[in-house]
Amino acid sequence: MIHTNLKKKFSLFILVFLLFAVICVWKKGSDYEALTLQAKEFQMPKSQEKVAMGSASQVVFSNSKQDPKEDIPILSYHRVTAKVKPQPSFQVWDKDSTYSKLNPRLLKIWRNYLNMNKYKVSYKGPGPGVKFSVEALRCHLRDHVNVSMIEATDFPFNTTEWEGYLPKENFRTKVGPWQRCAVVSSAGSLKNSQLGREIDNHDAVLRFNGAPTDNFQQDVGSKTTIRLMNSQLVTTEKRFLKDSLYTEGILIVWDPSVYHADIPKWYQKPDYNFFETYKSYRRLNPSQPFYILKPQMPWELWDIIQEISADLIQPNPPSSGMLGIIIMMTLCDQVDIYEFLPSKRKTDVCYYHQKFFDSACTMGAYHPLLFEKNMVKHLNEGTDEDIYLFGKATLSGFRNIRC
C-alpha cells in the first residue's frame, strides 16, 4: 500500500516537471519569434539598400536608444556625403609655359632674335614676371594699350600727298560696339573642326591676312566683319588688289616700327613700304573701309607681355593674332578665340588652307607667341574642356569692366 502511494506521487512529480518544461520551452520560442519580428521591422530590404548605397547622401545607423516613455527602440543617424566624382582633366596649354618647351631649333632662333634686336628694343619697365590677377591684367591692358588708327590729322598723312586716301569715318564710329565676337585664327587645327556655324553665330568675326572662307565654311564659317593684315601681305601679295577676298569686311593693316617710334619716324622707315599699294587699293575701292593701325600699339602690347613673362621674350612685335584679340576686346563685351590655344586637333600644319608644316606656328619663332598664349590662357574665363574640344578661349572685353 505504501509502495503504491509513493509510485503515484513520483508519477505526479514527473508529470508536473514535464508540464513546467513544456511551458518554459513555449515561452522561450515566443520571445525568440518576437525578437525576430522586431529585427525584421528595422531591417532595410536589399533592393532599398542598394539604392541608398548608390545615392549621393547615405543614412548611417548608430546604436539604438530606448525611449523612456515607450518601450520602442529609437534609431539615431547622421548624414554622410559621398565623395564627389572628380571632374575629368584636359591636357591644354599651360599658362606658365617657358622656353624649356621649345625644341633645340626654336631655342636657337629665340637666342638669335635676342642678339639681333632688329627693332632696337630697350625695355625699362617692371618685371619680368610681374603677377596680375585676371581682373587687374584686363584693366592694365585697357589702360596702357591704345587701339587707334592713323587719321588725316596725323603728320605726314595730313599733307596733300595723302589727301582723300584715308577713310573719312572714324574707326570707332564705324565698328561696334558688339556683344559677342569671334577671333578666328588661321591654324591648321581648324580643319575638320565643324565650328563654322558656331563662329557665324557671333555678332562680329575677325580673320587674319589671306585666310579664306570659301570651301572651308563648315570649319571656319563664312562671316567676315574685320580682316587684320600685316604689311608684308599687302606689299607682296600679287592678288591683293584683285582678289574679292580683300573686299569683304573692314580692312586693317599694321606695320611694325622701331621700338616706340612716333608716326613720322616710322613713316620714314617702315618694315614693309606698303603705302603705294594702299593708295592703289583705295583708288580701286574708294568705298571699302581700309584703316592703318598706329605703330605705337603693338609695342604698348609687347611691353605688357614682357612685364608679365618670366623669361626674356623675343624683341619683335606681337603676332597678328594677339593684336586682333586686343582689337576685339576694345570693341566687344565677350571675345571667343578659336584655335589660338591649340585643341586636341593640335598639329604642325600652320594653316587650315595650306599644307605648310612648322612647329613655330604653334610655339613661336619670330613673334613671342608662346608668351602671348600664356597671357590668353591666364585671361581665359572659359573651361579647359572648351579649349581641349574646340580650341576655344573666352575673354571679357574692356567696355564694361570696372577698374
Swiss-Prot record:
Region described as Catalytic (soluble form): 63-403
Result for mutant: Q354A: No effect on catalytic activity
Tissue expression per record: Expressed in hepatocytes (at protein level). Strongly expressed in liver, spleen, lung, kidney and submaxillary gland and weakly in heart and brain.
Organism annotation: Rattus norvegicus (Rat)
Record bears the keyword Chloroplast: no
Keyword Glycoprotein assigned: yes
Name of protein: Beta-galactoside alpha-2,6-sialyltransferase 1
Effect of Y272A: Strongly decreased catalytic activity
Function: Transfers sialic acid from CMP-sialic acid to galactose-containing acceptor substrates.
InterPro entries: Glyco_trans_29 (IPR001675), GT29-like_sf (IPR038578), Sialyl_trans (IPR012163)
Consequence of changing S231A: Protein destabilization
Cytoplasmic side: 1-9
Location(s), subcellular: Golgi apparatus, Golgi stack membrane; Secreted
Subunit structure: Homodimer. Monomer in its soluble form.
Signal peptide region: none
Topological type in the membrane: Single-pass type II membrane protein
Biological processes annotated in GO: N-acetylneuraminate metabolic process; negative regulation of chemotaxis; negative regulation of macrophage apoptotic process; positive regulation of mononuclear cell proliferation; protein glycosylation; protein N-linked glycosylation via asparagine; regulation of substrate adhesion-dependent cell spreading; response to ethanol
Top-level taxonomic group: Eukaryota
Transmembrane segments: 10-26
Lineage, top ranks: Eukaryota, Metazoa, Chordata, Craniata, Vertebrata
EC number, UniProt record: 2.4.3.1
